[in-house]
Amino acid sequence: MADGTIAQDQAQSQGIWRVREGITSALGKEGAVYKYDVSIPLAELYTLCEVMRARLEAHGALVTGFGHLGDGNLHLNIYTPGRFNKDPAVLAAIEPFVYEWIAERRGSISAEHGLGVMKPAFLRMSKSESMIELMRGIKGLLDPKGILNPYKVLPPLSHS
């Protein structure tokens, strides 16, 4: 952990949120951004940034991270200054490595914003089949017709 801030009042809290919301937007003006919202043990929260910096240096990608100290949530942002199209070689250097690294530390590949369309295939790296089935059951209770974010929440049923 390099630095941290605890808001002392409502105004400071709002200021912190403005900065937080502006980071990814600002990075997007510099180049393509690869965003990951992950949860890892607090002791290794920033280690992932350091590991990814070393891994992506040859690709000219830069890495920044910020998050929630209390719950181990890291917003990992990787960007390619001056290159606005996502590069398959950069993506291949990130995935599945980033998910494997997180799984080895018993973290979660999706901390707070859901799986989207890109992560369901990787969910089994950080969640057991029984946990995924429990998640599927809860989703079924809350959305019995499957109309909320269809195909973006859970991976297909395993046939193993």
Say what each PLM segment does.
Residues 36, 76-78, 113, 119, ...:
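A structural signal for short, well-ordered beta-strand segments
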Residues 96-98, 138:
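Alpha-helix-loop-beta-strand connector modules within alpha/beta enzyme cores
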Residues 5-19, 110-125, 154-158:
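Short proline/glycine- and acidic-rich turn/helix-capping motifs at secondary-structure junctions
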Residues 120-160:
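Activity-critical C-terminal alpha-helical subdomain
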Residues 103-115, 144-148:
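Alpha-helix capping/hinge segments and adjacent helical runs
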Residues 1-94, 101, 105:
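C-terminal substrate-recognition/cap domain of FAD-linked oxidoreductases
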Residues 71-75, 83-86, 116-119, 155-160:
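Flexible loop/turn segments at secondary-structure boundaries
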